[in-house]
């Protein structure tokens, strides 16, 4: 029978996922209190950075935004991704991989599970469109993006490490 104990990398990933979810949800409660739920409400923050209320009903680039079943499809997909990543992290041996997985798990739970179940859409509010980045995003989105970048970096570093050991 397989062991149900959580590995060191698992603890790292779950702690980072929990922090990501908490920061994401606190920031969304704060922004909803500050701007209300009305889409388009905006407040300049610092230079080119604004806080702008956006209801994101779809996924990247607005995919599935007009679909009645898209919300539930995204919730189901997110559950599968979180389960898959939770299994993967227990096989992980490198902390960087665990950190990346934790950020992605936290982002998936914050955006596609909590927001879509509670609001029916994802609450986006970080607006840097004046810096030529047209998408409004949130902390969970940032967690997913940074997490994916860390997975790529970990993959590159582990391959480089394998190559250096082969040439010795």
Curated annotation (Swiss-Prot):
Pathway: Protein modification; lipoprotein biosynthesis (signal peptide cleavage). It is a multi-pass membrane protein. The keyword Hydrolase applies. It catalyses: Release of signal peptides from bacterial membrane prolipoproteins. Hydrolyzes -Xaa-Yaa-Zaa-|-(S,diacylglyceryl)Cys-, in which Xaa is hydrophobic (preferably Leu), and Yaa (Ala or Ser) and Zaa (Gly or Ala) have small, neutral side chains. The active site is at residues 124, 141. The keyword Phosphoprotein does not apply. Keywords: Aspartyl protease, Cell inner membrane, Cell membrane, Hydrolase, Membrane, Protease, Transmembrane, Transmembrane helix. Its EC number is 3.4.23.36. It is found in: Cell inner membrane. It is an enzyme of class 3 (hydrolase). It comes from the Bacteria. GO terms for cellular component: plasma membrane. GO terms for molecular function: aspartic-type endopeptidase activity. InterPro entries: Peptidase_A8 (IPR001872). GO terms for biological process: proteolysis. The chain crosses the membrane at residues 15-35, 69-89, 95-115, 133-153. Belongs to the peptidase A8 family. This protein specifically catalyzes the removal of signal peptides from prolipoproteins. This is Lipoprotein signal peptidase. It comes from Caulobacter vibrioides (strain ATCC 19089 / CIP 103742 / CB 15). The gene is lspA.
